[in-house]
């Protein structure tokens, strides 16, 4: 889990647009966030396996 102070810092309006970054809405992780779902890869995988994300299913070939 991310520190509450870091989450609060990220949510503030940044002075420059390039300083803004995405964070997982579920756990607060700043890296490997899938923008469409606003989730990190770990949370995305957990929710996809449980079937809680509509339209997403495990790939098999």
From Swiss-Prot:
Chain positions recorded as Zn(2+) binding sites: 24, 27, 40, 43
Origin: domain of life: Bacteria
Cofactor(s) this protein cannot do without: Zn(2+)
Gene Ontology, cellular component aspect: small ribosomal subunit
Gene Ontology terms, MF aspect: rRNA binding; structural constituent of ribosome; zinc ion binding
An individual GO BP term: translation
Cofactor binding remark: Binds 1 zinc ion per subunit.
Keywords: Metal-binding, Ribonucleoprotein, Ribosomal protein, RNA-binding, rRNA-binding, Zinc
Hydrolase found in the keyword field: no
Keyword Glycoprotein: no
Database matches in InterPro entries: Ribosomal_uS14, Ribosomal_uS14_bact, Ribosomal_uS14_CS, Ribosomal_uS14_sf
Classification via SUPFAM superfamilies: Glucocorticoid receptor-like (DNA-binding domain)
Complex formation: Part of the 30S ribosomal subunit. Contacts proteins S3 and S10.
Function as written in the Swiss-Prot or TrEMBL entry: Binds 16S rRNA, required for the assembly of 30S particles and may also be responsible for determining the conformation of the 16S rRNA at the A site.
Family: Belongs to the universal ribosomal protein uS14 family. Zinc-binding uS14 subfamily.
HAMAP family named among the record's database cross-references: Ribosomal_uS14_2_B
Protein name: Small ribosomal subunit protein uS14
Gene source species: Macrococcus caseolyticus (strain JCSC5402) (Macrococcoides caseolyticum)
């Amino acid at each position: 889990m991310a520190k509450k102070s870091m989450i609060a810092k990220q949510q503030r309006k940044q002075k420059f647009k390039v300083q803004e970054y995405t964070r997982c809405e579920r756990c607060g992780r700043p890296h490997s966030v899938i923008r469409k779902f606003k989730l990190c890869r770990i949370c995305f995988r957990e929710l996809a396996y449980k079937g809680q994300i509509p339209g997403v299913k495990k790939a098999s070939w």
